[in-house]
């Protein structure tokens, strides 16, 4: 009878898988200096300083003012699941591989898509609450897509959002518009096998990441897995700099209880998985995120 802690054994595998398959992975690593205040709360520093004053060339300097406080954010997305596995369905001599297969399928079909759905919808919630830039009136076409993009880029430039590191998340439909956009210049490459690559990987040094449209809704129902809410709107693109976001995985737990470990396992295996995380848009950096949304 044993309990295997697979979260430790599969740490590298999961990290590589998430980096490859989680579209919003870059947002999960932003602002590493922000720490947890307690088990459920992270604290966002808010530092305000006064500006220069005229120097009088007499002894002493002008006194400035400094204000330092914290904006607490409580993590709320705490998810878990368990599966009972009959011993006839698992080869005990290859236990790790069997659990890895369960984990791989669950992460691919459930956990990773849900994390993207939650993260992108949470960005929309933050933009709505902080009155950020959400365009829900312009109909995107190949003729105006670059103009809409340039307008959002200009707003960020004017607000002092860093140029380096901006990411443009787009649905396949918007990605298709970018390929056909009026005024866009591309270098078309032909490799040794005569395959033609027409992909647009960046725009004005902004990295483009294509995301399934099902993962870019404004609202989801998380009662049983993750499904788009009936009144959800479609997010078409998100232009964001990761510095305006704080996202944290607080707790990850993956265990397998062997037969007879406790009364629930009986003669079978019990697989448990828990993930506790959240994402927050920083109010003072709301200019670092913009969206285009189509109403349902």
Question: What are these regions, as identified by a protein language model?
Answer:
Residues 2-28, 35-51, 71-76, 82, ...:
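Sequence/fold signature of self-assembling virion shell proteins
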Residues 3-8, 63-73, 104-117:
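Phosphate-binding glycine-rich loops and adjacent basic patches that engage nucleotide phosphates
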Residues 13, 43, 49, 62-64, ...:
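Structured, hydrophobic secondary-structure cores that serve as assembly/anchoring elements
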Residues 30-32, 156:
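Catalytic micro-motifs at enzyme active sites that drive phosphoryl/nucleotidyl and oxygen chemistry
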Residues 57-61:
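Glycine-rich loop at the start of a catalytic domain that most often binds anionic cofactors/ligands
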Residues 90-159, 172, 291-296:
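Alpha-helical scaffold segments that mediate packing/assembly in large oligomeric complexes
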Residues 122-139, 150, 154-155, 159-182, ...:
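Internal, well-folded beta-alpha domain core
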């Amino acid at each position: 009878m044993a309990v295997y802690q697979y979260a430790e054994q599969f740490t590298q595998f999961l990290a590589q898988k998430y980096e490859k398959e989680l579209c919003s992975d870059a947002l999960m690593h932003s602002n590493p200096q922000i720490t947890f205040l307690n088990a459920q709360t992270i604290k966002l520093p808010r530092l305000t300083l006064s500006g220069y004053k005229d120097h009088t060339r007499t002894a002493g300097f002008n006194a400035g003012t400094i204000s330092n406080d914290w904006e607490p954010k409580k993590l709320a997305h705490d998810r878990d699941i368990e599966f009972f596995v009959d011993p006839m369905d698992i080869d005990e001599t290859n236990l790790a591989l069997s659990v890895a297969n369960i984990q791989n399928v669950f992460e691919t079909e459930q956990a990773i898509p849900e994390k993207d759905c939650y993260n992108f919808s949470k960005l929309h919630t933050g933009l709505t609450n902080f009155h950020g830039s959400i365009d829900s009136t312009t109909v995107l076409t190949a003729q105006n897509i670059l103009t809409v993009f340039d307008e959002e880029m200009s707003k960020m430039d004017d607000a002092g959002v860093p140029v380096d590191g901006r990411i443009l998340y787009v649905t396949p439909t918007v990605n298709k518009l970018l390929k056909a956009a009026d005024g866009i210049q591309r270098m078309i490459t032909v490799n040794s096998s005569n395959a033609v690559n027409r992909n647009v990987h960046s725009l004005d040094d902004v990295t483009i990441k294509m995301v399934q449209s099902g993962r870019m809704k404004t609202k989801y129902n998380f009662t049983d897995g993750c499904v788009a809410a009936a009144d959800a709107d479609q997010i078409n693109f998100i232009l964001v700099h990761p510095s305006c976001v704080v996202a944290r995985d607080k707790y990850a737990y993956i265990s397998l209880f062997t037969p007879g470990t406790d009364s629930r396992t009986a003669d079978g295996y019990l697989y448990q998985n828990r993930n506790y995380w959240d994402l927050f848009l920083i109010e003072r950096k709301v200019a670092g995120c913009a969206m285009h949304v189509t109403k349902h």
